From Swiss-Prot:
Site-specific tyrosine recombinase, which acts by catalyzing the cutting and rejoining of the recombining DNA molecules. The XerC-XerD complex is essential to convert dimers of the bacterial chromosome into monomers to permit their segregation at cell division. It also contributes to the segregational stability of plasmids. It comes from the Bacteria. GO terms for cellular component: cytoplasm. This is Tyrosine recombinase XerC. Residues 1-85 form the Core-binding (CB) domain. The gene is xerC. Keywords: Cell cycle, Cell division, Chromosome partition, Cytoplasm, DNA integration, DNA recombination, DNA-binding. The keyword Iron does not apply. Residues 106-285 form the Tyr recombinase domain. GO terms for molecular function: DNA binding; tyrosine-based site-specific recombinase activity.
Length: 295
């Protein structure tokens, strides 16, 4: 089983050029799957049948996995078994026709304009704070994913024309604009970046000079949010969701927001129309003479 997996990781890394972060996620899911199979004395991929796949999902749910994680586990297994079919090691993919439990629609949480101002109202001159402010400004200004921001190099950014070249999901490249506040914050960071003794061309580096990790970015944002007095937990998703919601509220251009976010399907972007409708409903309730509630 492990031999086939090792060939699969090489395939994803070399031929598909998948990001290390995505590969790590798949590894985690398939490692957990192998443990479940071992409990059933299944030690070969040819022994995996549709009923075994359903058992994996049921056992994973019993272990506490939520709908989103179950979908990810099934997706990782489906992709791997498809690889084995392509390699001629399996005749059919046993996941065919099996769906993960439907996920409930959870609207992303976002910050309002006042909270964003509160978040970014910090002019500390400490080099690490200058770096973190640049990360915050760029994430909110461009709506980048955590993995996209972490993967930026010095040549990815152009502060003169205020554009950043991003490698998104599926190794797709897109160019995203950013605002003057983000441009200024990045220029300030570039002035002090050398103090961190950078070891490569990464735009954002740790205090050890290495490319800053996903986890470090998450921890720094969380710390920054607490320090700025935000009541809610700050994370990269919240910055991206806030960017999308505020752009949609201001422009109502769903297609443009789709391009900026790097969504391949418009349906993925449409969740923000629910948020936008909530905003419009509030405006309607406050403004329309036949909607105002009696006092």
């Amino acid at each position: 089983m492990l031999t086939a997996l090792n060939r699969y990781w090489d395939y994803l890394r070399i031929e598909r050029q998948m990001s290390p972060h995505t590969i790590t996620n798949y590894q985690h899911q398939l490692d957990a799957t192998i443990k479940i199979l071992a409990q059933q004395d299944i030690h070969a991929w040819t022994q995996v049948t549709p009923s075994v796949v359903r058992f994996i999902l049921a056992e994973s749910k019993k272990q506490g996995l939520k709908e989103k994680s179950l979908a990810l586990r099934l997706s990782a297994l489906r992709r791997f078994l498809s690889f084995l079919v392509q390699q001629g090691e399996l005749k059919v993919n046993p996941t065919t026709g099996i769906s993960a439990p439907k996920q409930g629609k959870h609207l992303p949480k976002n910050m309002d304009g006042e909270q964003v101002q509160q978040l970014l109202a910090n002019d500390s001159k400490e080099p690490i704070d200058i770096r973190d402010r640049a990360i915050l400004e760029l994430m909110y200004s461009s709506g980048l994913r955590l993995s996209e921001l972490q993967g930026l190099d010095l040549n990815s950014i152009n502060t003169r024309v205020r554009e950043v070249r991003v490698i998104g999901k599926g190794n797709k490249e897109r160019v995203v604009p950013f605002g003057r506040y983000a441009s200024h914050a990045i220029q300030e960071w570039l002035k002090v970046r050398a103090l961190f003794n950078p070891k490569d061309e990464a735009l954002f580096v740790s205090q050890l000079g290495n490319r800053i990790s996903h986890r470090a970015i998450q921890k720094r944002l969380e710390t920054w949010g607490i320090r700025q007095g935000l009541n809610s937990h700050l994370n990269p998703h919240k910055l991206r969701h806030s960017f999308a919601t505020h752009m949609l509220e201001a422009s109502s251009d769903l297609r443009a927001v789709q391009e900026l976010l790097g969504h391949s399907n418009l349906s993925t972007t449409q969740i923000y129309t629910h948020l936008n409708f909530q905003h419009l409903a509030e405006v309607y309730d406050q403004a329309h003479p036949r909607a105002k509630r009696k006092k």
